[in-house]
Amino acid sequence: MPRSFDRFSLRGPLALALCLLGLALSASPGAAADPRGVSPASPNPLEGLRFFVDQESPAWQQWEAYRRSGQTAKANLIWKIAREPRALWLGAFTRPHFAVKVRRLIDAARAQGAVPIFTVLRAEATGCGPGYTGGSPAEDARTREWYEHLARVIGDDRVVIAFEPDSLGTLDCQIPSRRDDRLRLLAQGVNALSRLPNATIYLEAGASDWEAPARTAKQLRIIGISKVRGFMLNVTHYDWTAANIRHGLDISRRVGGKPFVINTSQNGRGPVSYRSNHRRINIWCNPGLRGLGPPPTTQTSHPRVDAYLWLNRPGYAQGCQGRPIAWYPPRALGYARLATTWESPPRGSRFGHFKRYPLSAFGIPR
């Protein structure tokens, strides 16, 4: 796989073929016999897949812009993001022409001989506070139809779906009378998508620095974990991979041994935290001085972990602190500069790369 943009300066078919060959997550190009992989005892359905790299993404376009303008150092940094397969986010924001856009991504993946990963974010689960309803019955109906529409658009195509990040962890953000509605809505979405014959699905399960495993496991059973491959962790958080493995194994034993995947797109330096009432509180909203984590792979540290995947979008700012959800090149460059393959803090380094957090670690997008 190229580590410098200079080695990818030839844009012909041979260069593209070599690049895509290097993106295979396994030496074998074959897919599992059962793409759904519902039984925990079935082979890892991600093993041997080549995942889609979107050459229309902001990261890829940024790399090309730096390359064209001769900014070699920045191009080499952004290439660390652009070259990796990352999830494609779908939601109410995927408009207009939702079906056309989804089919275009699926067709582009097929042209690469690859499989797209979709992070589905359609449920109203981004707010929090007194009186927050998380939508309405009418909005729930629109979301149910959206799930069904997505299922029709995907059809028989091979895909991986990361279903509704944060939707369980933020359940208590809703007013009590709406919480069961959220669970019913998620269950209906799981039911619609789990019927897809060639979709490997992982459900939202928070992160190791969030809800207790017993509570998350109960919610997973309610929304239909038995119908899909497993669950996902750390999609919007930054906690260490090793911590998420421990947390995930605790959840897994409570849901019949279901496998899981971990988002490692932004946890190469771990979380930024502070102490409050003798508890460690991790900052999830655009912490500074974070780094890319282990690249996507099915070669993980535990057999119950199907893969480390980049389910989030490094270089984007999350929609908080008054900032829109958007691509910020300085933030992307920062992630790339501080990239590591660490799964836990190295010995002698309390917070990854420094003993104390500098003030900038608590800042907004950098």
Spans of features found by a protein language model:
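Bacterial N-terminal signal peptides that target proteins for export
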Residues: 2-15
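Bacterial N-terminal signal peptides
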Residues: 13-26
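C-terminal region of N-terminal signal peptides and the immediate post-cleavage residues
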Residues: 23-41
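N-terminal carbohydrate-binding/catalytic regions of secreted carbohydrate-active enzymes
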Residues: 46-149, 153, 313-337, 346, ...
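Surface-exposed substrate-engagement region within the catalytic domains
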Residues: 53-78, 208-337
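Structural preference for beta-strand elements that scaffold enzyme active sites
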Residues: 115-117, 158-162, 198-202, 228-232, ...
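Short glycine-enriched loops at secondary-structure junctions
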Residues: 120-123, 162-167
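Active-site cleft segment of glycoside hydrolase catalytic domains centered on the general acid/base Glu
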Residues: 133-158, 165-199, 207, 211-215
